[in-house]
Amino acid sequence: MLAKRIIPCLDVRDGQVVKGVQFRNHEIIGDIVPLAQRYAEEGADELVFYDITASSDGRVVDKSWVKRVAEVIDIPFCVAGGIKSAEDAARILEFGADKVSINSPALANPQLITDLADKFGVQCIVVGIDSYFDKETGKYQVYQFTGDEARTKATKWETKDWVQEVQKRGAGEIVLNMMNQDGVRNGYDIDQLNMVRSVCNVPLIASGGAGAMEHFAEAYKKTNVDGALAASVFHKQIINIGELKQYLKQQDVEVRL
């Protein structure tokens, strides 16, 4: 049985780590490299960096910090932000990232998923999906440009359909960002994860809602996700990653210690 992954998420804007609630009102958390180092030392299995305004600003992720992070950590890390071509992805991978993640650019050009998977291998290609539960329609809808409040918008895709589409096109992993839960710290959306898991045959990472150690255990036990991503509970030192792994081990969840 593969060990479940614990993945701190670092949202980056203007060279600093920030965190919002439900993708709004971002506050500065601190500098990128020291935080990355801290999480690697605490026992994180992987890190994810989102340059949150790159897509909405029409630019690619700022690569200067990618190289600095690669120099100081020895765990895999994934970078996202405005990657619109194989050339963009190649540069980020050359600077030391292990994976690239695409979100809004994949919605604008789904062929990009296939192009990247063909060039770099599916194991390098993550698709991030920002999913919002619309209480009026009772449906999960995919959103794009979520790094910028003014430009965030719904797409034509329902979450389940987009999950199936990106797999057909070569996504090697999916990160499901559950917008209603983001930063609220009241637990992952178990129903949504199970709905997506039922049609997802690649590794699935839960994102949005972690507030306590039991939320991680619940996600792993009730939905069979491969990893859980969290931000504010780690940034604010509410949860220590080493202690979280010991707790999960006691709950019979397979983790790397």
UniProtKB/Swiss-Prot annotation:
Xref: InterPro entries: Aldolase_TIM, His_biosynth, HisF, IGPS_HisA/HisF, RibuloseP-bd_barrel
List of catalytic residues: D11, D130
Localization: Cytoplasm
GO MF terms held by the record: imidazoleglycerol-phosphate synthase activity; lyase activity
Pathway this chain belongs to: Amino-acid biosynthesis; L-histidine biosynthesis; L-histidine from 5-phospho-alpha-D-ribose 1-diphosphate: step 5/9
Role summary: IGPS catalyzes the conversion of PRFAR and glutamine to IGP, AICAR and glutamate. The HisF subunit catalyzes the cyclization activity that produces IGP and AICAR from PRFAR using the ammonia provided by the HisH subunit.
Top-level taxon: Bacteria
Catalysed reactions listed for this entry: 5-[(5-phospho-1-deoxy-D-ribulos-1-ylimino)methylamino]-1-(5-phospho-beta-D-ribosyl)imidazole-4-carboxamide + L-glutamine = D-erythro-1-(imidazol-4-yl)glycerol 3-phosphate + 5-amino-1-(5-phospho-beta-D-ribosyl)imidazole-4-carboxamide + L-glutamate + H(+)
UniProt main location, coarse: cytoplasm
UniProt-listed Enzyme Commission number(s): 4.3.2.10
Family statement: Belongs to the HisA/HisF family.
Quaternary data: Heterodimer of HisH and HisF.
Keyword Ligase appears in the UniProt entry: no
CC per GO annotation: cytoplasm
Protein name, UniProt field: Imidazole glycerol phosphate synthase subunit HisF
